[in-house]
């Protein structure tokens, strides 16, 4: 569970205190760690654009927010990003499981997997792709500060190889 633990520790050390999550198989270990933490509010969402709305409200109420999701949800959330986050300069950290790329078993995930980086670029969301738990920890710490400097979301995109760190004994 080394990959998920690195993300969790970085979120904790960055004082992220409010998370909205949309279930994904790759995020299951991370979600379990977060759900066991009484100092982090985790609101499960049914769709990613719902998570963007919930986190916008939490930010306006003084919370330091993150959204945990898979990449297909960016396609569902472009209007919320453009009309809410861009217009009102709302920072949030995006922890994104990159589906539809390496090792993908579900054909329907592949188109969005190929387009995700371009979509994030069109949305002007800075995106980082950690390859190791150590790099993930450092980049999350950096990104959680940077999002406030730019008053906008910052994304971390985790591919299938990253989640293999959770399989290590």
From Swiss-Prot:
GO terms for biological process: coenzyme M biosynthetic process. The keyword Iron does not apply. Its EC number is 4.1.1.79. Disulfide bonds: none annotated. It holds the Pfam family TPP_enzyme_N. Keywords: Coenzyme M biosynthesis, Decarboxylase, Lyase. Involved in the biosynthesis of the coenzyme M (2-mercaptoethanesulfonic acid). Catalyzes the decarboxylation of sulfopyruvate to sulfoacetaldehyde. It is an enzyme of class 4 (lyase). The gene is comD. It comes from the Archaea. Inhibited by oxygen when heated in air at 80 degrees Celsius. The enzyme is reactivated by addition of dithionite. Heterododecamer composed of 6 subunits alpha and 6 subunits beta. Transmembrane segments: none annotated. The lineage of its organism: Archaea, Methanobacteriati, Methanobacteriota, Methanomada group, Methanococci. It catalyses: 3-sulfopyruvate + H(+) = sulfoacetaldehyde + CO2. Belongs to the ComD family. Pathway: Cofactor biosynthesis; coenzyme M biosynthesis; sulfoacetaldehyde from phosphoenolpyruvate and sulfite: step 4/4. This is Sulfopyruvate decarboxylase subunit alpha. It comes from Methanocaldococcus jannaschii (strain ATCC 43067 / DSM 2661 / JAL-1 / JCM 10045 / NBRC 100440). GO terms for molecular function: sulfopyruvate decarboxylase activity; thiamine pyrophosphate binding.
């Amino acid at each position: 569970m080394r990959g998920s633990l690195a993300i969790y520790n970085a979120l904790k050390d960055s004082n992220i205190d409010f998370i909205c999550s949309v279930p994904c198989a790759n995020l299951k270990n991370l979600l379990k760690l977060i759900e066991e933490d009484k100092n982090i509010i985790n609101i499960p969402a049914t769709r990613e654009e719902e998570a963007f709305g919930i986190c916008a409200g939490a930010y306006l109420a003084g919370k330091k927010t993150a959204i945990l999701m898979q990449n297909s949800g960016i396609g569902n959330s472009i209007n919320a990003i453009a009309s809410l986050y861009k217009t009102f300069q709302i920072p949030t950290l995006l922890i994104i499981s990159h589906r539809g790329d390496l090792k993908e078993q579900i054909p329907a995930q592949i188109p969005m997997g190929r387009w995700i980086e371009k979509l994030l670029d069109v949305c002007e969301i800075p995106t980082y792709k950690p390859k190791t738990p150590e790099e993930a920890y450092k980049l999350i710490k950096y990104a959680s500060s940077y999002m406030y400097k730019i008053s906008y979301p910052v994304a971390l995109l985790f591919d299938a190889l990253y989640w293999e760190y959770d399989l290590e004994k």
